Amino acid sequence: VSVRIAPLRLEGFEQLPKHARRCVFWEVDPATLGRDDHLSDPEFEKEAWLSMVMLEWGCCGQVATPSAAAGGADESPCLGYVLYAPPRAVPRAHRFPTAPVSADAVLLTSIGVEPAPMADGLPRELIAGAVEELIRRGVRALEAFGRTAAVGDLLDPRNVPPDVAPVLEAVGDCTVEHCIIEADFLTGVGFTVVAPHRYFPRLRLELDKGLGWKAEVEAALERLLESAQLHAPVGASAPAGSVSSRSGAAVDPAAQLRLSAVESC
């Protein structure tokens, strides 16, 4: 079953995974709650935030669904999602020691993938969907606050520096481990660190080159395939099982090369 990446619609809010519907780590500033660190209805707050951003700015997310699912995208099970917004619409953004987000950038806040056989490579495809949509809208860059492996040190309150304490203030069940994207993942999909930090670096992906990282890989694979075809003897057969599926059906060599490249990234 193939996967379809499509813009998030407010009508599809109920299809988002439970954590995505209830997490308001980015959308609610704890300072506005006073002594109460819980919301009576976090799902309502999240849906209201999405509605506001969509109304004032436009699409702020992408969702992955099975392309072969019956019914429309709003009824299909959600396999994964990615959310982003202008930094001015993200109350949590100003709390990071590596803030502010650059004036020309949109802030990537959340990405999640449900356990499924087709989940491999899905986070990268979600990022690609977001990048493609933002390029069409003329956005120059996508930035994100990442978390490093060192955040485990912060479990001991004695290790929490003053500039990090505001980041750790959470609402409800939200935590930095669950609600901040891993910095290693971000660098793996092309982001570069523009504001280093031991715990929460800020990273940036330039969009003015389009899907450069993806296009370069595709172009290299095409050149490799063309070279292999030029040097192959006429009528030569491939080794058994080299470009065939387990069922014995032939597989397009170009597709096989692309799949290998994605799996190795």
Question: Where are the language model's segments positioned?
Answer:
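Terminal substrate-recognition subdomain of acyl/acetyltransferases
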Residues: 1-57, 82, 143-265
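Conserved acyl-donor/pantetheine-binding loop and adjacent beta-alpha core of acyl/acetyltransferases
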Residues: 51-56, 62, 70-118, 153-157, ...
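Short, high-confidence coil segments that cap the C-terminus of an alpha-helix
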Residues: 59, 136-139
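Short, hydrophobic/aromatic alpha-helical segments in well-folded domains
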Residues: 107, 126-130, 190
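Conserved acetyl-CoA-binding loop-helix of GNAT-fold acetyltransferases
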Residues: 113, 118-135, 143
